[in-house]
Amino acid sequence: MARNATNKLLHKAKKSKSDEFYTQYCDIENELQYYREHFSDKVVYCNCDDPRVSNFFKYFAVNFDNLGLKKLIASCYVENKEGFSSSEAAKNGFYYEYHKENGKKLVFDDISVSSFCGDGDFRSSESIDLLKKSDIVVTNPPFSLFREYLDQLIKYDKKFLIIANVNSITYKEVFNLIKENKIWLGVHLGRGVSGFIVPEHYELYGTEARIDSNGNRIISPNNCLWLTNLDVFIRHKDLPLTRKYFGNESSYPKYDNYDAINVNKTKDIPLDYNGVMGVPITFLHKFNPEQFELIKFRKGVDEKDLSINGKCPYFRILIKNKRLQK
């Protein structure tokens, strides 16, 4: 299956520090259209991006005036550009700052980058200095370093919009941030992130892997999402509920180790149930904090995985409906 095959590629990426997955311009454009109001007079930092090839940098440079940006910064870990840049491999990481002085427009083929003293890792003191000067971080960080990456954004109290694997929301620290309403899912998830450009040395697995008209090698894992702390109107829309619990109790079995019912699909959440419900993790894509309360993740009262007749469904989030209907 295509999903299984491309997941192998994502697993392969976790073994690489550089995680060479480049985001397509169309996916960036599709997501960023919902956040335009946040960028006026802001400094945007893409801290995992070679400015000469990054579509994140390109998007913000092209839309610099439309968004009303103050400054755009991109920085790159030295290995990120291997296989993507036509120039000689740099000895150090590098960065580029763009603020459109004197009305000059950026020529992408003529970007003169500045070198770091070190490798340009996002955790380096040089990269952190740029982070401190920025307002909003937007990028596709290395999957293998996701926890450290998110921790850093939280530590420095930065606004952000980043790409992550769907399974990242099962991390305890990530779920807690979502539960505390400090971060949330963006607009697009799964097939809403259409694919990633990969270098020549990556094998193209699965029926959804392809080479586009520009010769880019693209894989489509269909299991990625956007995480952010930029508010967007869509997350405040109520999830329409059409199913009922009463009269259909057999469709909603109770857990062995928690006083809650199991709901296999988000669309099957009953509108008339007053108690706690266990729902799939992808529910968070539809989560409206005014409509639902997040109770707990995955575990029962015995701190073991939630189970039904001794069998454990895939990770569940325990929730409660704040707007009960009859």
Swiss-Prot record:
Family matches, as PROSITE patterns: N6_MTASE
EC class: transferase
Keyword hit for S-adenosyl-L-methionine: yes
Entry-linked InterPro entries: DNA_methylase_N6_adenine_CS, EcoRI-like_methylase
Protein name: Type II methyltransferase M.EcoRI
Entry's EC annotation: 2.1.1.72
Gene source species: Escherichia coli
Family according to the record: Belongs to the N(4)/N(6)-methyltransferase family.
Classification lineage: Bacteria, Pseudomonadati, Pseudomonadota, Gammaproteobacteria, Enterobacterales
Record key words, sorted: DNA-binding, Methyltransferase, Plasmid, Restriction system, S-adenosyl-L-methionine, Transferase
